[in-house]
């Protein structure tokens, strides 16, 4: 799933994610199993989440985005500054309708 979003779908997700607050923060410990589990839970609840990479994080923002995307099975919709958006469609009850 991580790379099957079209440009139009990414644009739609970026618009929806603009007003979101970061639900997950990556700090000095980097991406731990607990953080990945928390991100997965938030994706199940919301489908689209914003993640912030703190300055103390040992990973580059792009590396962090790609690693968390791979560990959660989510699509990377956007990387902007120290934040990025992850999207994982709920197969049972989708809340976000993609174009």
Locate the predicted segments by residue.
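Positively charged, polar, low-complexity stretches
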Residues: 1-99
């Amino acid at each position: 799933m991580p790379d099957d979003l079209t440009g139009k779908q990414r644009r739609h997700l970026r618009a929806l994610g603009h007003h979101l607050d970061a639900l997950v923060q990556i700090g000095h410990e980097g991406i731990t199993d607990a953080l990945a589990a928390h991100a997965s839970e938030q994706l199940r609840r919301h489908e689209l989440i914003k993640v912030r990479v703190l300055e103390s994080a040992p990973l580059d923002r792009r590396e962090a985005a790609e690693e968390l995307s791979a560990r959660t099975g989510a699509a990377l919709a956007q990387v902007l500054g120290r934040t990025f958006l992850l999207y994982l469609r709920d197969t049972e009850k989708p809340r976000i309708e993609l174009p």
